[in-house]
From Swiss-Prot:
It is found in: Cell membrane. Widely expressed. The keyword rRNA-binding does not apply. Belongs to the cyclin family. Cyclin Y subfamily. GO terms for molecular function: cyclin-dependent protein serine/threonine kinase regulator activity; protein kinase binding. The lineage of its organism: Eukaryota, Metazoa, Chordata, Craniata, Vertebrata. Its main location: membrane. The gene is CCNY. This is Cyclin-Y. The modification Phosphothreonine is found at T30, T37, T67, T75, T331.
Length: 341
């Protein structure tokens, strides 16, 4: 092979641009020398440094980068608060429950065991803001996610399928159907959102009315295989979505992985950030988690869990503690004199 160019190129996802995206015509520059052309290849270490630099600004990889869905929802949240202030309406229609000395209200959602129903609602709301507040100029589209080219049902796709934004309830019903049929957990929903934002960042695409279902389906498919111990097979999704083929599911999964650059790792810090940002999104949109008064049984359970964690922490500190020897018990190796003739 050497410096020669190989004719064997791996198949990549087909790109399609909308009316807003135009490609400039390619004009070859005859003044370029041989060193400035393809023979001057970039070293792999340089590419790794660039990837590390970009990763710091990618919310799905770096815990300090703010999530995309939360930033996209800020405009709508400010408009809602402004309209409520102008119309002199209270900020929330649902009366909030506040804890007192005698009663403590807690929800049953934790970072390790989130509430399934409300987590799916929050993820659907995050996807809704992604679609609603997408780039107005339009970005690159991929054929594998186009519902007109790869329909999920045999019913005819309407001609204006890419014009109308889906409602939050429609997104919620689609995600809930997949999670209920496949018996997926709430943690899988959070990982689904991580993969979705990672896809939008890596592939530099937008989620829109034409592709949101297949993007969400691909993210759920991948998250269920990575997160759950008993992964759902592609043929199982074909039984849920009756009109889709196994070959289409396999191709969707393959191209989704390629666009993610096979980066399916989700650090615990990134997972926790997405969980708490989803809670912030729910609070800003009056989508509060169900609160229940703290009962005696639940208090004993929380106390037992805290004691267990405290005992584990003490054991770790005890095992990590270094032991020092005193001068009384200190023994040094003795060397016997050697005679060199």
């Amino acid at each position: 092979m050497g410096n020669t160019t190989s004719c064997c190129v791996s198949s990549s996802p087909k790109l399609r641009r909308n009316a807003h995206s135009r490609l400039e015509s390619y004009r070859p520059d005859t003044d370029l020398s041989r060193e400035d052309t393809g023979c001057n290849l970039q070293h792999i270490s340089d590419r790794e440094n660039i990837d590390d630099l970009n990763m710091e600004f990618n919310p799905s990889d770096h815990p300090r980068a703010s999530t995309i869905f939360l930033s996209k929802s800020q405009t709508d949240v400010r408009e809602k608060r402004k309209s409520l202030f102008i119309n002199h309406h209270p900020p929330g229609q649902i009366a909030r429950k506040y804890s007192s000395c005698s009663t403590i209200f807690l929800d049953d959602s934790t970072v390790s065991q989130p509430n399934l129903k409300y987590t799916i609602k929050c993820v659907a709301l995050a996807i809704y803001y992604h679609i609603k507040n997408r780039d107005p100029d339009g970005r690159m589209l991929l054929d594998i996610f186009d519902e007109n080219l790869h329909p999920l049902s045999k019913s005819e796709v309407p001609p204006d399928y890419d014009k109308h934004n889906p409602e939050q309830k429609q997104i919620y019903r689609f995600v809930r159907t997949l999670f209920s049929a496949a018996q997926l957990t709430a943690e899988c929903a959070i990982v689904t959102l991580v993969y979705l934002e990672r896809l939008l960042t890596y592939a530099e695409i937008d989620i829109c009315p034409a592709n949101w279902k297949r993007i969400v389906l691909g993210a759920i498919l991948l998250a269920s295989k990575v997160w759950d111990d008993q992964a759902v097979w592609n043929v199982d999704y074909c039984q849920i979505l009756k009109d889709i083929t196994v070959e289409d599911m396999n191709e969707l999964e393959r191209q989704f992985l390629e666009l993610l650059q096979f980066n399916i790792n989700v650090p615990s810090s990134v997972y926790a950030k997405y969980y708490f940002d989803l809670r912030s999104l729910a609070e800003a949109n009056n989508l509060s988690f169900p609160l229940e008064p703290l009962s005696r049984e639940r208090a004993h359970k929380l106390e037992a869990i805290s004691r267990l964690c405290e005992d584990k922490y003490k054991d770790l500190r005890r095992s990590a503690r270094k032991r020092s020897a005193s001068a009384d018990n200190l023994t040094l190796p003795r060397w016997s004199p050697a005679i060199i003739s």
